[in-house]
Amino acid sequence: MKKYTLLSLLAITLVLFSCSKKDIAQPLEETQNEDLSGYLEIASINLGGLGAAEITAFDPSTNRLFAVNNGAENKIDVIDISNPSSISVIKSISMLPYGGYVNSVAVSNGKLAAAIESTNKQAPGKVVVFNTSNYEVLKTITVGALPDMVTFSPDGNYILTANEGE
């Protein structure tokens, strides 16, 4: 009994002395919501129905926007936005040769990375890397099951995927 009393006393002492006033959370910095009334729509484009234009990536070197379009077809739409008041789809890159649906795109240093799931969602997926100017395939990389997101490292030397692996 004395053993448990001593252990309890030590535990209580430890808890009391491990807390300090500086551990108390400070109030968060107040944030201001942006006034959205200053934003105006300058253009819009219809890429299809459900599943169209879910994920996009912009390439500043070509002024092109790459949009995942899993609506009626499995493709990436290439949108010229060099003139923002008159945007248009200039190309569609079919994802059919690469497996299942494209889930994500990212752009860095003239390269477009597309995360593509396998037709069997538990099998390894792919990241296909395209040139953003001529859409040629630069590399195909096998990744984990169901790659749901793709991004480049800040220096553009590495590609990272988040795989759902259902």
Where does each model-flagged region fall?
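Bacterial N-terminal signal peptides
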Residues: 8-16
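Bacterial N-terminal signal peptides that target proteins for export
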Residues: 1-7
